[in-house]
């Protein structure tokens, strides 16, 4: 059995952030599929035994169960000495961007993806428009930051990049965003991450499992 066991599902970009680090760092790990759509993470026993917060990813290591992707990435970088900040200034920038990612970048993009493609009934257009505006605002900030950089902190990939790209490899039919057309600097950085040894698409890296199904495809008119 691998030292690291990741409770995850293929549709979870937050889980992909951790899986991507493990693969690119050459660390042996195994995925543990979660019945997300079936309510496993809401089960009282699962919460008592795996994660009281009722969320994935959860990384099992040496009898511990670590949760929250940003915290896990920080722990992995410090533990293994790769993809982390190299000095105090980078440490501050890492924390700053991880918080921004969780609150604005991934937070809005992942929510829009669910509302766009995975709710049982179509989401009201006004709600979708509001969420799209939040995505566009957050992505514009990162796209501008990356305009003269290869990666978020300079010329090498770090956990900031792994965190930000968590949901960026899902198909446009799910997300409704054509990143290459709308955010070229983000798209270029995303391609650099995909060129790293160990990278795989999320649905290949993690078990598809029982996640929220894609019930609608984004149309050309909804792409940005």
Regions found by a protein language model. Give the residues of each.
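GST-like fold's C-terminal all-alpha helical module
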Residues: 89, 97-195
């Amino acid at each position: 059995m691998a030292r690291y066991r990741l409770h995850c599902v293929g549709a979870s970009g937050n889980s992909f952030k951790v899986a991507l680090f493990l693969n690119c760092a050459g660390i042996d790990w195994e995925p543990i599929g979660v019945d997300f759509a079936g309510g496993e993470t809401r089960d009282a026993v699962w919460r008592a035994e795996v994660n009281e917060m009722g969320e994935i990813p959860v990384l099992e290591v040496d009898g511990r169960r670590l949760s929250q992707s940003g915290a896990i990435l920080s722990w992995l970088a410090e533990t293994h000495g790769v993809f982390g900040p190299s000095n105090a200034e980078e440490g501050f920038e890492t924390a700053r961007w991880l918080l921004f990612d969780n609150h604005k970048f991934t937070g809005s993009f992942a929510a829009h993806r669910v509302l766009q493609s995975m709710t049982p009934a179509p989401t009201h257009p006004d709600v979708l428009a509001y969420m799209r505006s939040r995505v566009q605002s957050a992505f514009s900030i990162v796209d501008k930051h990356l305009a003269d950089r290869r990666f978020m902190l300079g010329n090498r990939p770090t956990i900031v990049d792994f965190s930000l790209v968590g949901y960026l490899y899902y198909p446009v039919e799910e997300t409704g965003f054509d990143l290459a057309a709308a955010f070229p600097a983000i798209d270029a950085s995303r391609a650099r991450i995909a060129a790293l040894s160990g990278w795989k698409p999320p649905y290949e890296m993690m078990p598809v499992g029982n996640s929220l199904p894609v019930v609608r495809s984004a149309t050309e008119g909804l792409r940005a």
